[in-house]
């Protein structure tokens, strides 16, 4: 486990005009950890021990980016996307719906189903959403904490398509741009707004953000 060296002074974060993207990049540098390979661990503030005031600012920025799209529901996948998706849904004043990775006893009736590959865990997950919560009148904003190769996002798009719902776009906290999933989906016409985009990452060289 290798901690990323914090190279930015706190006073820089406080300067007037610092954007949400810059605040997030600074936080990643300060508190993120690069694990072997392509894993960026940000569980100290984003997806395990959640810094609610900070993540809420990210959610407000995602709301600003999509405020004119008529969003009726926010869609994510369990579990690490739930926090940012919930706060984004709160900003919109709409429900948040998350796809489950297994059918539990409290889900009854018909479901939409797709498959998402987890590169972190090296396995395929069948994800499901109850049909009673997603329909053709919905305008969906997909929210997730990470975008890498695009498997989870593609699975959520598939579920929305099965439901006949309109996807207005996707809001991502951290995109690993170098893994190509985001650009591939953009080429297919999906609007994706990422608050931080990583150009390259390694334990030796640290993180380089896209500019």
Question: What are these model-derived regions, one by one?
Answer:
Residues 1-143, 147-211:
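PRPP-associated nucleotide enzymes
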């Amino acid at each position: 486990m290798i901690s990323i060296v914090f190279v930015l002074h706190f006073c820089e974060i406080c300067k007037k005009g610092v954007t949400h993207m810059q605040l997030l990049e600074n936080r990643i540098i300060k508190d993120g950890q690069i694990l072997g390979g392509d894993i960026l661990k940000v569980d100290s503030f984003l997806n395990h021990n959640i810094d609610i005031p900070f993540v809420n600012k990210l959610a407000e920025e995602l709301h600003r980016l999509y405020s004119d799209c008529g969003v009726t529901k926010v869609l994510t996948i369990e579990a690490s996307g739930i926090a940012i998706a919930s706060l984004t849904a709160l900003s919109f004043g709409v429900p948040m719906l998350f796809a489950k990775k297994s059918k539990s006893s409290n889900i009854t009736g018909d479901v939409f189903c797709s498959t998402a590959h987890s590169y972190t865990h090296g396995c395929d997950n069948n994800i499901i959403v109850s049909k009673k919560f997603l329909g053709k009148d919905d305008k969906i904003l997909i929210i997730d904490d990470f975008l890498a190769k695009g498997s989870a996002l593609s699975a959520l798009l598939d579920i929305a398509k099965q439901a006949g719902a309109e996807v207005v776009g996707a809001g991502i906290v951290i995109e690993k741009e170098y893994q190509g999933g985001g650009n591939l989906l953009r080429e297919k016409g999906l609007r994706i707004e990422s608050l931080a985009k990583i150009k390259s990452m390694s334990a030796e060289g640290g993180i380089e953000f896209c500019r």
